[in-house]
Amino acid sequence: MDPGAGSDSSLTVNEQVIVMSGHETIRVLEVGVDAQLPAEEESKGLESVAAGGSQSGGPVEASGPAEAGSCDPDHSAEATVAARSPSESCPSDCHLQPSPEPASGITDPDAAGCTSCPPGQVAGQQGLAVWTIPTATVAALPGLTAASPTGGTFKPPLAGLQAAAVLNTALPTPVQAAPPIQASSPAQPRPPAQPQPLFQTQPLLQTTPAILPQPTAATVAAPTPKTVDATPQITVQPAGFAFSPGIISAASLGGQTQILGSLTTAPVITNTIPSMPGISSQILTNAQGQVIGALPWVVNSASVATPAPAQSLQVQAVTPQLLLNAQGQVIATLASSPLPQPVAVRKPNTPESPAKSEVQPIQPTQAVPQPAVILTSPTPALKPSAATPIPITCSETPTVSQLVSKPHTPSLDEDGINLEEIREFAKNFKIRRLSLGLTQTQVGQALTATEGPAYSQSAICRFEKLDITPKSAQKLKPVLEKWLMEAELRNQEGQQNLMEFVGGEPSKKRKRRTSFTPQAIEALNAYFEKNPLPTGQEITEIAKELNYDREVVRVWFCNRRQTLKNTSKLNVFQIP
């Protein structure tokens, strides 16, 4: 694009100068927007103030027709690039003022570099954005080599490009920029104007989520020009760079042009600003002209489509997806809103005054999720998002106990089964079975012999615990009820008849469990307190007194001693 095309409202690419010094970092320019201003502004040159870098703010002096006094020297191992006017070429004497670097690495507002441009050179507004790149990262890109410690100058190719920038991988503090405003249209009258405040661009590749911009000494020292009522309002928020891992790896490893050739003609976002054609993306190239990345602009079309004397253009840069180190390893990833919906990222803001350049700090809100840097391993990790717990559904049918235990469960389920009736029957069945002296195994064996294997001992056990589905319980209930009634009738006729009904040989029949009355338990505990290890004669006397079998009493004493051993209360007894 012709740098001097200032008559139309379009984006112009200013000539770029990158001064590298030593082993630290470099800084890069930003783009400018041409707009028609009233005629009297041609005679009123405005000085452009370039804010210092993010680490030291070393000044750069540009020799020209008009030159402002440079600020205090700051010995820095960085290089600063100033945005230049379209008609001004880079003089050969652009040099770096060595300046001391602060120990803390934070930008000193008083050390901001001050440059001046000749009057009548730049039309409209120009934004100066400064980015820093470690020299190690520059050395990894093909064609971008670090200069000698004494300083060097090189220009990246700008042929056919509408805007250019350089990747920033180290931004510890916000970088400040000042737009120079100069007159270019001599054909229009000049109405009364207001001061045009300088704005600052705030990069987001920092560990802090949002930092409010602070005014610097350079901003205060800038001369206040006469403002124009119809000056367009521009809010620029460069949030970073969007890179593809394949592009980065190809560029850092010296990739061929055929790998990157398809990327030169396809911008990331094709939406353009109606009043300023050509603003679609900023393309990043190396010294050989190979495309290594693109910085697309997201335009809020709601505010652009409203024609007004003070049109408000809000431009927001796409946030980066990956952050690489000098070796090409991913050291950070940026979680943000999806790229295909750029218009919905920010809501249009009502301008407070007709002519005002705002700095809108990005702050996280509930409605608009803002990006946040997540330090990761070489493999990019996704930022976890807060989600409501998802209930885990099970395909298994709930058991009767689960259904009955629910407080608001109706007594009838979807199949018309009375769950409360089944619960009461299971409880009564266990009591009646124990009263007959029968075990679950005996009942299971008897039912298996007559009804089949579905009525085994495990089925009886699950039924009594209600660990069974309602349908299975409904199937077991009538069979168990019928069998239990017949067993009680046999028991009334005699124990022998019951055993014959239950089945099984007497020799293999399990011995009936002995149950002690409360009085017998109290007497046995009294004897146990006197003598935990009674002799055989004493056991016989206790059994006769309580009217129990001698073997039953002996086993009770054994079990009682074992219980104390298990509870660690018996430690003085010695069994002979």
Swiss-Prot record:
Tissue distribution of the protein: Isoform C1 and isoform C2 are found in the brain, while isoform C7 is found in the testis.
UniProt keyword annotations, A-Z: DNA-binding, Homeobox, Nucleus, Transcription, Transcription regulation
Domain (POU-specific): residue spans on this chain: 414-488
Region (Disordered): 65-88
PROSITE patterns per record: HOMEOBOX_2 (PS50071), POU_1 (PS00035), POU_2 (PS00465), POU_3 (PS51179)
One Pfam family this sequence matches: Pou
DNA-binding region in chain numbering: 509-568
Gene3D superfamilies in alphabetical order: Homeodomain-like, lambda repressor-like DNA-binding domains
One GO cellular component term noted in the UniProt record for this chain: nucleus
Cellular location(s): Nucleus
Keyword set includes DNA-binding: yes
InterPro entries: HD, Homeodomain-like_sf, Lambda_DNA-bd_dom_sf, POU, POU_dom, POU_domain_TF
An example Gene Ontology molecular-function term: sequence-specific DNA binding
Function text: Transcription factor that binds preferentially to a variant of the octamer motif (5'-ATGATAAT-3').
Entry's family note: Belongs to the POU transcription factor family. Class-6 subfamily.
Database matches in PANTHER family: POU DOMAIN, POU DOMAIN, CLASS 6, TRANSCRIPTION FACTOR 1
UniProt name for this protein: POU domain, class 6, transcription factor 1
Source organism of the structure: Mus musculus
Taxonomic lineage: Eukaryota, Metazoa, Chordata, Craniata, Vertebrata
